A protein has these predicted regions:
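Catalytic core of membrane glycerolipid acyltransferases/transacylases, capturing the structured
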Residues: 1-43
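Non-catalytic C-terminal accessory region of glycerolipid acyltransferases
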Residues: 46-172
Length: 172
């Protein structure tokens, strides 16, 4: 989903975008120049806050995945994001950047969801992340529905709710 979104946003905005992504994905050809890597298993480098600040202060459109992880399959078989983190709200307000919600309609393989469930229950790290490239190649040539919502002005995120509550509001 991230690669497809980057392609669409990149074409529409002349390549002026950056991803905030798991740093493991920086090993994929072509992603490193357009990404700011987040270390999800250890500590971020001392340069990380500076890189994030530079990204948000630039003319680049920042692509963030508010859940921080891929969607998970629930016991009833439905696929849902885990609760969204508040970071996109706090960064929106801090850097006075509007939020444009995007919904990517697609799903990963049953194998991916089984690995994710096992990893979530039994491992201290996200093993499923290691299989994302495989999932991407399984979907080459397939069509997906991408819905791009109306921009939400950063001023919307006022003190009437906490950043976490605003994140839940945008997700809903």
């Amino acid at each position: 989903d991230g690669v497809a979104l980057g392609s669409i946003i990149g074409q529409h905005y002349d390549g002026n975008f950056r991803y905030l992504v798991n740093d493991l994905l920086l090993n994929l050809p072509g992603l490193k120049p357009v990404s700011i890597g987040i270390n999800k298993t250890g500590r971020n480098s001392r340069d990380f806050p500076r890189m994030v600040e530079a990204g948000f202060q630039s003319k680049n459109h920042m692509l963030m995945f508010p859940a921080g992880l891929n969607s998970r399959k629930r016991d009833d078989g439905t696929i849902h994001d885990i609760p969204w983190k508040k970071t996109f709200i706090s960064k929106s307000v801090e850097y006075q950047r509007d939020v444009v919600p995007i919904h990517f309609g697609g799903q990963n393989s049953e194998r991916f969801y089984r690995i994710a469930r096992f990893s979530d229950k039994h491992l201290p790290f996200n093993l499923a992340m290691m299989f994302l490239v495989d999932e991407m190649y399984k979907n080459v040539g397939k069509h997906f529905r991408i819905a791009i919502g109306k921009p939400i002005p950063w001023q919307t995120f006022d003190k009437s709710k906490t950043a976490t509550e605003w994140a839940q509001y945008v997700e809903d």
